Curated annotation (Swiss-Prot):
Molecular-function annotations in GO: G-protein beta-subunit binding; GTPase activator activity
Subunit description: Heterodimer with Gbeta5. Interacts with RGS7BP, leading to regulate the subcellular location of the heterodimer formed with Gbeta5.
InterPro entries registered for this protein in UniProt: RGS, RGS6/7/9/11, RGS_sf, RGS_subdomain_2
PANTHER family in UniProt: LP21163P, REGULATOR OF G-PROTEIN SIGNALING 11
Gene3D superfamilies linked: Regulator of G-protein Signalling 4, domain 2 (1.10.167.10)
Protein name per the record: Regulator of G-protein signaling 11
A biological-process GO annotation: negative regulation of signal transduction
Amino acid sequence: EACEELRFGGQAQVPTLVDSVYQQFLAPGAARWINIDSRTMEWTLEGLRQPHRYVLDAAQLHIYML
């Protein structure tokens, strides 16, 4: 749901939403931590440098494929 909100939300909200999703689900010690493989995490972390609405797509796909 968070990734869908990011994808279809306003462009001005993208950096805030990306950071929020990262902190909540992917950051070390996150409250609702989700384990993704190292390659997907690497791509995601690279994308966080210049966040865009599709930066979390690889992580979302990885989670769906589990």
